[in-house]
Amino acid sequence: LAIDPDSMSSLMASDCLQHYQLLLTRILRYRDHTLSPAEEQLLAMQAEMSGTANKTFRQLHDADLKFGFVENEKGEQVELGNATFSQLLISPNREVRKTAFHQYYDQFKAHENTLAATLCGSIQTDVYYARARGYESARTAAMFPDNMPATVYDNLITSVRNNFEPLHRYYDLRRRLM
């Protein structure tokens, strides 16, 4: 990235770098979003601090939330947690599934303010880094590594929104039958 664009174009045109053309093109896309060495150093120094929201969520989710126990279809008490939740949701016994579902998500409801604060912190971090690097938005910055146009994202969201009804009918039918 430190090589001036004209020199880099000449280098990339050479036969010896043809094998690395795609890799170099991907790297060079970041030129407009790369800061001066001093500015990059400042961003690097706050990397650990910017991960606080994610670390807080991981600690809450992986260590602090206690989901209790659920009686499975065999009458055994099973500790409800991230590892057992999906297993209990496929139980043939409707009451086991219902209890596991509500008991699991009740913990998230009980900690909704903490979860909201961690989400807010994560969003603020994304917005800060996007602005610092000169992206139009945090969404644009998130899609940049995959070279995905915003229209692809927008079309996906529109398509999902327009097709919720069949999914809702499926879950309603499933709820009634199971």
Task: Describe every region a protein language model picked out.
Residues L1-M178:
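A well-structured
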